[in-house]
Amino acid sequence: VPPTAPPVRSSPADDALRKLSALIEDGALATGTLLPSERQLAERWSLSRVVVREAARKLEQRGLVTIRHGIGVEVTNNPALPVQHTLERLLPSDQERLRQCAQARLLIEPELAAAAAVRATPKGLRALKANCAALAAETDLARSAALDIAFHDAIADLAGNKVLAVMLRSVAQLGRLSREVTLQRFGVARAHGYHVRILAALAAADPAAARKAMKLHLEAALGDLA
């Protein structure tokens, strides 16, 4: 009988990291709120403040919080943020960044739309419909771009692939400027029309139609950057 390996003991920092991650991911600490102070967390869990500080740094590396010196640790719950920062360093040129982001979306999103057509729930479809209605009525450029991004993020979530959803969110935030340029040049009506066609394909549970509608939408977006 082979010897049994001794159990791996987690460090106090890992324990604190697990507890804080659970509070954020379970929704007990909402996005935009501040974590309890280092002292409060250290007393609550009988840990040193150094251990709590290290756990906060690891949370920031994962995109779950942002450390704001002099203010506290703010919950951001954005796992895409570290990837986004890496891409910003790799692609310092705004124009090249926008072009490559649009190309990446064209490769990723049609398949996400096809998967979402199979997995979409009535609740998810209602949320997309509400988003379309809000976009049609919106007149502010920045809010229109935010609604556009939210529509695509929601489809990625419906597709059920967390890896691709995080990748898409990273790319979407980097390419936000291209959305604002497109909305400014063509108005909301064009984007809204594409979204309505995508939503119709999702509601019909038609993966091929959803893939095609998304592909046409993103080909137009890529063409806008030419």
Question: Where do the model's predicted regions map?
Answer:
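Well-ordered alpha/beta subsegment
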Residues: 203-204
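Conserved amphipathic alpha-helical segments that form helical-bundle/coiled-coil interaction surfaces
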Residues: 101-180, 191-197, 209-219
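Short helix-capping and inter-helix turn/linker motifs at the boundaries of alpha-helical repeat units
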Residues: 11, 142, 186-190
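Charged, amphipathic alpha-helical interaction segments
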Residues: 21, 41, 60, 110, ...
